[in-house]
Amino acid sequence: LDISIEDASKLRQNYWDTYGATLKGLIKHHNIDPIDFLSTTHDLKNFNDLVMPEVNLKETISNIKGRKIIYTNAPKSYTDRILKISNIYEMFDEVFTIEDSDFTPKPNQASMANFLKKFNIKEGVFIDDIKENLKTAKNFGLSTIWITKEITHHSFIDRKIEKISDLLTF
């Protein structure tokens, strides 16, 4: 787009507020190719130096019972790379990325419905660091765990933890 940085920032925020992701607005209003956009905005150069997995991450994940499915607004290449660098790729049964949701991000209701249908999820625990995503999950009947240091409470949050390894205390 041929616009100023200031206008781009406003447009980005408007699309984020309206669609839940900048990309969705760019696709709808500017015919932006989502694959080109994602490859540009999720450039993986020097990526290994930026990923710092939490201590006890593998132990924590291995102690989670049932199917473990990643549901992310990130692209597949980016997600796979993070999981591999963190040495936890093989610990997950499935990965559902922004491409799988037709570029419709969480917390969108249709995206959540598509995710649940694809993996035939009727019940489960949804863990996220964004409360809006948890609200959608709760609306679909899932239990919710919010990763946060916030002290506020919301009726759609079942549990709060500060870091993933806190799951070991359950």
Annotated model-derived regions:
Residues 1-55:
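N-terminal helical cap/lid subdomain that shapes the substrate entry/recognition surface
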Residues 9-11, 44-48, 66, 98-99, ...:
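Short, contiguous strand/loop micro-motifs
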Residues 35, 58, 62, 69, ...:
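Asp-based, Mg2+/Mn2+-dependent phosphohydrolase catalytic module
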Residues 48-52, 70, 103:
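Short, surface-exposed alpha-helical recognition segments that flank or form part
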